[in-house]
Amino acid sequence: MLQPPNILTIAGSDSGGGAGIQADLKTMTAMGAFGMSVITALTAQNGLGVTGIHAPGPEFAALQLRTVLDGFPVHGAKTGMLFNAGIIHALADILDAETFPLVVDPVCVSTSGHQLMEDDGIAALRDRLFPRADLLTPNRPEAEAFTGVAIKTDDDAIEAGTRLLDMGVKAVLMKGGHVEGKPVFVTDWLLEKGHEPVALRQPHVDTQNSHGTGCTLSAAIATQLGFGLPLRIAVTKAQEFLNLALRHSYAPGKGFGPVNHMAGLKK
């Protein structure tokens, strides 16, 4: 049997288990990879929201990353919640020397509206990690925050994605999940330097149990890149994984439930 790829998540911990590193590791495992983690923040949260955040110092975040890299080859990685500029700079100093595929999910605000990044982290993320990113996966509010473009149409999404490419990222997946009403399809736009934008559509799933969707998608893409797939195919497979997880999502407790990462493993 071929050995599975080693995939790394650099993100915050969700005590409720639906998002963050918990969602990432479930995704990697369900896809047949070996998941590893660098924890950038501890969050106290559940399906109702975030009640507190505790972040380790930048030195300990960097120590986790160096220790993982010293012990394991990494075939793909993603970043999620990074919380502040100090952590971002400490991690970027190490990541700049690495060549594995890196998916950057620019997490700024939780689904419940809680700020997950301090104000100084926005510029640090843009300046230090965007140039290292093989793919950036912003949702609409995140893309608007980084570009200043009010996204209401597909043309707006493409304009915002183009501006993000100009900031140094190699490719951008403009996620279309933040839409009003009940559309038949959700359209994500994949933009790569030197290529025309590509519309990637998936059936819309009408559910309130969507906690951890962004984390799951970026982890799934990083995993597929770790298997050696080309970017567009990796994104498509990740979308399919997330869509299935959404269709089988449920609420194990109060509030918004998580997607079901194990849906594809059921018999």
State the predicted function of each range.
Residues 1-4, 9, 20, 184-200:
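Acidic-glycine-rich active-site phosphate/pyrophosphate-binding loop
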Residues 2-9, 21, 25-116:
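Conserved N-terminal subdomain of the carbohydrate kinase-like
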Residues 4, 55, 71, 232-267:
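Charged C-terminal helix
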Residues 10-16, 197-211:
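Short pre-catalytic strand/loop immediately N-terminal to key active-site residues, enriched for Gly-Thr
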Residues 27, 144-145, 207-231:
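Short, small-residue alpha-helix embedded
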Residues 31-36, 196-197, 224-238:
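Phosphate-handling active-site elements
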Residues 42-43, 83, 108-110, 142, ...:
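Glycine-rich beta-alpha junction loops
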Residues 119-197:
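Conserved phosphate/ATP/ADP-binding segment of small-molecule kinases
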